[in-house]
Structures are given as structure tokens and as C-alpha cells.
């Protein structure tokens, strides 16, 4: 079996349509029309130009992570890999690339939100050694 060559690189706004299509193709993926609109993602990328990543095979985007920080703490959003490419280490490589980008900006602490019903995602984060926090409550103002 031929090994697929996957390239991890910084996400740019030129990637938006393909990344958005990837998000929309994943069952149960949580998208917000305001934050995840082209304008919302552009604002995010402009603020964090070097920290979000895509995984590409033959110029086709098969994975993506929005990653940013506020100068103190990083956050990962919309971590996803196309279903046909899972369990090949692609998600882990993208996360490692994001963490390296954050480290270059002197950000060492990173958070993320995984929905309770997202068994695949929760298993992934536990497998990567991330700590599940039971000592905090998460609040949101929309």
C-alpha cells in the first residue's frame, strides 16, 4: 500500500472555502454562522496569522485547526480530519504544528472545548495526553 504524503502548513484565507466545506461535511460539527462566516474566520486569521493549520494531500485540504491566542493562553477550535483520513496521525501532527507556532509566540498553555457527546474527539484528546478538567465550569455570553 502506497503511503500518502500529507503536508501540514499554515492556514490562509485562500483556504476558507475548502475548510468550510470540510467542516460542513462532518456530522455533528458545531458551526456558528457569525464566528465561522468568511468574515469571522478572516478576522481570526488576521489576529492570529501563523497559528492555524491545514493538512493537505495533493493540494486537497483533509484536515484543519483554527488556533489562536490572546497573548497569555492559546485555544484550539474546529479540530478536524476528513473521515477517510483519520487514525493516520494527521490530527496529532496538526496539533503539534499549532503548539509549536504558539510556543514561538511564547504561549505555552492551551485550552480547547470538546462537546461531551463527541466521543471521537474526546478519545483523541485523552490519547494525546491532554488533561480533562473537572474543577472548572465553562460559561458563555453570546
Residue ranges and their predicted role:
Residues 68-77, 86, 132-135:
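A conserved beta-turn-beta hairpin within the catalytic core of GNAT-like acetyltransferases
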Residues 92-93, 116-135, 141:
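Conserved active-site alpha-helix within GNAT-family acetyltransferase domains
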Residues 79-86, 114-115:
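A short, internal acetyl-CoA/4′-phosphopantetheine-binding micro-motif in the GNAT/acyltransferase core
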Residues 42-54, 75:
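A short helix-loop-beta-strand connector motif used in the catalytic cores of GNAT acetyltransferases and
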Residues 5-19:
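A short beta-loop-alpha structural element at the N-terminal edge
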Residues 102-114:
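Conserved GNAT acetyl-CoA-binding A-motif
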Residues 87-100, 127:
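Conserved acetyl-CoA-binding loop-helix of GNAT-fold acetyltransferases
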